[in-house]
């Protein structure tokens, strides 16, 4: 089986592992193929693939119909909005993603932004560089309300980091689970209430 790699984030260790399992691995991840690449640019890159380890490039119905050898797209990430799911089903092409791999990193980035704004890091940094130790009122994160739109992998990871900072965490999702409220120290609310009550809002949805 020929595996064509288009994602830029692919290490030699992963390549060697796939080859040890009998896969032919072809690296085509330094061609500048990215989100929104037209079909006539992407097709020559993946036309001979049985499986694709994909980056952010777009897979439209017209392209997927032409990829007669393709059996699987493995998305290096958790988002799949650039891949037409109806066309995948029609062509019998499978789809996987790297769920459980990036959620923690995204949650850390979210908390970094919250703390940046809560502590006005930009102003404090400027003060220190100017040697002017101004007394500023910094609201901080404690006792602030964080609203999560979506409570899947990323939402739960953000909650796990925000609660220890003393933040009140509320969330809205289509299928709330009461067990999550107790497990993560959060509260399910309506979208209207979330927008009304939150000091910070995080969209953690596809």
Ranges and model annotations:
Residues 136-206:
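Rossmann-like dinucleotide/phosphate-binding beta-alpha-beta segment
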Residues 30-37, 54-55, 126-134, 182-188:
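Short gly/ser/thr-rich secondary-structure transition/capping motifs
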Residues 18, 52, 73, 88, ...:
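Generic structural signal for small/hydrophobic residues in well-ordered secondary structure
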Residues 91-93, 98-145, 157-160, 164, ...:
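Phosphate-binding beta-alpha-beta segment of Rossmann-like dinucleotide-binding domains, i.e.
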Residues 9-11, 58-60, 102, 154, ...:
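Alpha-helix capping/helix-boundary segments
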Residues 36-40, 54, 97, 101-108, ...:
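Residues at secondary-structure transition points
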Residues 1-96:
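An N-terminal-biased, well-structured beta-alpha scaffold segment characteristic
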